[in-house]
Structure formats: structure tokens, C-alpha cells
Amino acid sequence: MLAVYLHGFILSAAMILPLGPQNVFVMNQGIKRQHHLMSASLCALSDIILICAGIFGGSALLSRSPLLLALVTWGGVAFLMWYGWGALMAAWRGDGVASSATSVTQGRWRILVTLLAVTWLNPHVYLDTFVVLGSLGGQLLPDIRPWFALGAVTASIVWFFALAFLAAWLSPWLNRPVAQRIINLFVGGVMGFIAFQLARQGFGL
């Protein structure tokens, strides 16, 4: 059982660690110390749902529906371009962290919607959880499959909360105006690059 658990943990960690929209978003919220634990919780919860769905049968749905994958891909491209453009504009204007209570309240809902979009409109999430984890986990015997899923879920939870806490710890150094401008440029560049890669996949290039 332990070997199966570790297999799921290591495989999931290997797919989560590369820089992606979720990691960038959680890192940015941690640096701002603005609902970063909520962001980590939502990312982990979304991963739990997707990982379990993929391992326990959802992978077949995605593999049999090219139209669904295309819709998710182009929805993701549009969203990432919009989000990346917003980050670049924030860097250009030198926007800082909202300080008023009203702004924080509005920010909570905006963070919630944005994070759900970053997660659920990202085709790579479905490929990782449904295709890779789902295919491998689906080949295991039913009695040990939950251990594989538990290992994969554990890696996701550990990673997102570690990222949020680390970013918050570094916040005093990274939350300065110059650093925020650099981070916004970085976020905009990453989102634009991922959108470009997704568009290439969508066109089959």
C-alpha cells in the first residue's frame, strides 16, 4: 500500500511543480497576503475533485469527447490572455495591493472567480488529472486504487499550502512597489506564454 501511495504522491508532485496558472496565482496572493490560504484551499479542493474523478472513471469521458477538450482549451486561451493582459496593465500603472475594506471584500469574490477559472479553464489540469493520473490509476486493482488517489491528493495539498505560506513569508521583501511591478510583468508573461502554447495545441501545430 505504501508503495502505491508514494507512486501517486511522486507522480502528482512531478506534474504540480512546473510553473502554471494555479501556482502563479497562489504565489501572487501569498505575496500580497490577500486570501492566500483560501486560494490554496480552493486549488487543493479542485485538485481533489479532479484527481478522484480522473482516477475513478472520468478519464474515459475526456478521451471520448474531443469537442469538450476543444471548448476547455479555447476557453482557457481566452481567459489566460485576459488575465495576463490585466497583469501587464497593472505593471504598467504600478498598481499596489488594495487597502480599503471595500476593496478587500470585492477582492475576495474576484479572487474566488478568478481562481476557479484558472483551475477549471486550464486544459493542462484535465490532461494531468484525467489522462495521466486517471489512466495510471485506472489500471490498478480496485482495492489499492484509493491509496494511489490519496497519494496524489496529498501531494497537491502539501504543495499549494507550502507555496502560499512561503510566498507570505517572503511578502515583506516581495510586496514592495518595484517588486510588485516585476511580479506583474512575470505573471503577465507566464500567462501569455501558456495561452500561446494552448493555442498551438488547439490548432494542432
Swiss-Prot record:
One GO MF term attached to the UniProt entry: L-arginine transmembrane transporter activity
Subcellular location: Cell inner membrane
Topological type in the membrane: Multi-pass membrane protein
Main location: membrane
Chain ranges passing through the membrane: 1-21, 42-62, 67-87, 111-131, 147-167, 185-205
Catalytic reaction equation(s): L-arginine(in) = L-arginine(out)
Coiled coil feature spans: none
InterPro entries, per database record: Arg_export_ArgO_enterobac, LeuE-type, Lys/arg_exporter
Alphabetized UniProt keyword annotations: Amino-acid transport, Cell inner membrane, Cell membrane, Membrane, Transmembrane, Transmembrane helix, Transport
Keyword Cell inner membrane: yes
A Gene Ontology cellular-component term: plasma membrane
Domain of life: Bacteria
Alphabetized NCBIfam families for the sequence: 2a75 (TIGR00948), PRK09304.1 (NF006801)
Function text: Involved in the export of arginine. Important to control the intracellular level of arginine and the correct balance between arginine and lysine.
Family of the protein in this entry: Belongs to the LysE/ArgO transporter (TC 2.A.75) family.
Protein name stated in the entry: Arginine exporter protein ArgO
Organism from which the protein derives: Yersinia pseudotuberculosis serotype O:3 (strain YPIII)
